[in-house]
Amino acid sequence: MNRLSTKLVVAIGIGSALYGILGLWGFSIAPNTFIKPALAILTVFGALFGPVAGLLIGLIGHTVTDTIAGWGIWWGWVISSGIIGFTMGFIQKRVGFSVKNGTYNKGDISYLAITGLIGIVIAIIFAGAFDIIVMGEPFDKIVIQVLGATIADVIVFLVLGLPITIGLAKSNKKHTHLKIEK
């Protein structure tokens, strides 16, 4: 069995705390549905530390948000955050990609964009289905929430998560185009 390194455990703890606290803030766009900039944390930490870290940060962080907010833990949405974090972490497994070393190409960015978008859609549909089947929520309400949450998460991913991750990778490049003059 693979053990989690101390570095990975610390990253999961920090990421979960950030995602959990930042998840308390957002802009309402539908019933119980918000644009939450915290989603960018899942993108960045997933890209830095991989799918397991992304999964655990999503699960733990969302549980923290729901607990602090006092509205009860909505497990379908907690699991959906884990799914999103997990899919954001797929990029870290690509050969040649490293945010830490600043190594990436256009194909890597496209891969992150595609896996991120697919992960968001799958996760939100899962959360909606869970709410209807397990929680007994009305179908009409959930359709609005699923559409709103999907749009909100895609916006945050494309406007914050992806650009921040690319920016971090660019800032960590090990080479420069500057030339040493003799």
From Swiss-Prot:
Disulfides per UniProt: none
Subcellular location: Cell membrane
Transmembrane segment boundaries: 9-29, 40-60, 71-91, 114-134, 142-162
Keyword annotations from UniProtKB, A to Z: Cell membrane, Membrane, Transmembrane, Transmembrane helix
Topology of the protein relative to the lipid bilayer: Multi-pass membrane protein
InterPro entries: ECF_substrate-spec-like, UPF0397
Gene3D superfamilies: 1.10.1760.20
Pfam short name (any one): ECF-ribofla_trS
One cellular-component annotation, GO: plasma membrane
Signal peptide positions on this chain: none
HAMAP family: UPF0397
NCBIfam families: PRK13661.1
Similarity-based family: Belongs to the UPF0397 family.
Cited PANTHER family: UPF0397 PROTEIN BC_2624-RELATED, UPF0397 PROTEIN SPR0429
Protein name per Swiss-Prot or TrEMBL: UPF0397 protein BT9727_2423
Organism encoding this protein: Bacillus thuringiensis subsp. konkukian (strain 97-27)
